[in-house]
């Protein structure tokens, strides 16, 4: 019997990735307060704590039957993390900082079912082109990037600002399929079974 998947996210990109791989799921966005988790300088540990918090929040609030999948993506550069910008001005500053530089995109995944918790993460290195300041505002407005970590999107105009990617492109979109495939095996679920 196929497991019932619960995606603990309202991210349209994560939904599209699951749909692309024909994984059936129900969406129950988490109410977890991400700002309640302090950042102590380790972006992997931070994103992992957020992913776990989201999964546990869904159990607490809804107690659904099924395999809960949550994820958290952060952009990290020189010891700082860049979440979703709080304003247009913050988005401009993020893009200025990342312009011409290489940063890490880290996504942590948490899978939770019947008190069994499995976690994993993926890191991708992304290098931006040198971005003319005059174009930053245009990019943010044209591609509505205020709801995206680091104030940018790989799939929406990413080719205008990204010079190079080393690693998983799905990770930069918010759900690294290779990592998810590996973690699902812990629940005896093989993604290949959905590709028929």
Curated annotation (Swiss-Prot):
Catalytic activity: dTTP + H2O = dTMP + diphosphate + H(+); UTP + H2O = UMP + diphosphate + H(+)
CDD domains referenced in this protein's UniProt entry, alphabetically: Maf
Pfam families according to UniProt: Maf (PF02545)
Broad class of where this protein is predominantly found: cytoplasm
Keywords: Cytoplasm, Hydrolase, Nucleotide metabolism
One record GO biological process: nucleotide metabolic process
InterPro entries per the UniProt record, alphabetical: ITPase-like_fam, Maf-like
Residues annotated as catalytic: 72
Site note Important for substrate specificity, residues: 13, 73, 155
Function of the protein: Nucleoside triphosphate pyrophosphatase that hydrolyzes dTTP and UTP. May have a dual role in cell division arrest and in preventing the incorporation of modified nucleotides into cellular nucleic acids.
Protein name (Swiss-Prot/TrEMBL): dTTP/UTP pyrophosphatase
The organism of origin for this protein: Chlamydia abortus (strain DSM 27085 / S26/3)
């Amino acid at each position: 019997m196929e497991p019932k998947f619960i995606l603990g996210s309202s991210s349209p990109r994560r939904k599209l990735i699951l749909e692309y791989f024909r994984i059936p799921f129900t969406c129950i966005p988490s109410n977890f307060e991400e700002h309640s988790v302090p950042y102590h300088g380790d972006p992997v540990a931070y994103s992992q704590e957020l992913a776990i918090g989201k999964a546990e929040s869904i159990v607490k609030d809804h107690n659904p039957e099924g395999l809960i999948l949550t994820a958290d993506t952060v952009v990290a550069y020189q010891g700082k993390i860049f979440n979703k910008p709080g304003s247009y001005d913050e988005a401009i500053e993020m893009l200025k900082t990342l312009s011409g530089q290489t940063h890490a995109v880290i996504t942590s995944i948490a899978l939770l079912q019947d008190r069994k918790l499995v976690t994993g993460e993926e890191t991708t290195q992304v290098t931006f082109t040198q971005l003319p300041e005059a174009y930053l505002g245009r990019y943010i407005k044209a591609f509505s990037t205020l709801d995206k970590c680091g104030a940018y999107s790989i799939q929406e105009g990413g080719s205008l600002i990204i010079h190079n990617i080393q690693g998983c492109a799905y990770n930069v979109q918010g759900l690294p399929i290779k990592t998810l495939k590996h973690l699902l095996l812990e629940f005896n679920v093989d993604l290949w079974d959905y590709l028929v």
